[in-house]
Amino acid sequence: MILYLHGFDATSPGNHEKMRQLQFIDKDVRLVSYSTLHPKHDMQHLLNEVSRQLQQSDDSDPIIIGVGLGAYWAERIGFLNGIRSVLINPNLNPQENMVGRIDRPEEYADIAGKCVSEFRGKNQGKALVILSRKDQVNDNQSVSEQLGGFYQICWDEEQPHKFPVLASHLPQINLFKQA
């Protein structure tokens, strides 16, 4: 089973296309949607929904995949649920770069303060990070520096931030899922 978390643009048709591409790895791809506007509510909703989806599956190696803001959540929710995650162009600082786009971006800082201390060290090796060199939203060199000591980093030379085409990375995601 693959749980897919969309980014800030929840209604983008690209989300459906990415889910179709992920079906080459696993026929059971499930969208886990969230508001994107209310971080504290989103966290509780995602924890509950992912837990429910895991209980309904007999997959011994489920993964959670997120793009952009979805990758922010995939890392945390994956850690809290004990499953591995794939982070595609993760937004690591939504409390800074979501100002003006959501009602309470400061809630992200509050969530980070309440998260398990040094959770990345405890989650080491349990995430695969795919970063675009042509990401027009994130500073992915900085993302690589922040996450490289904890997770495997894979660079993509072509895709923009929303990463519409996963094809060249599907074999790597599949190996990571089965590892």
Curated annotation (Swiss-Prot):
Coiled coil: none annotated. InterPro entries: AB_hydrolase_fold, UPF0227, UPF0227/Esterase_YqiA. PANTHER family: ESTERASE YQIA-RELATED (PTHR35602), UPF0227 PROTEIN YCFP (PTHR35602:SF2). Belongs to the UPF0227 family. This is UPF0227 protein Ssed_2836. It comes from Shewanella sediminis (strain HAW-EB3).
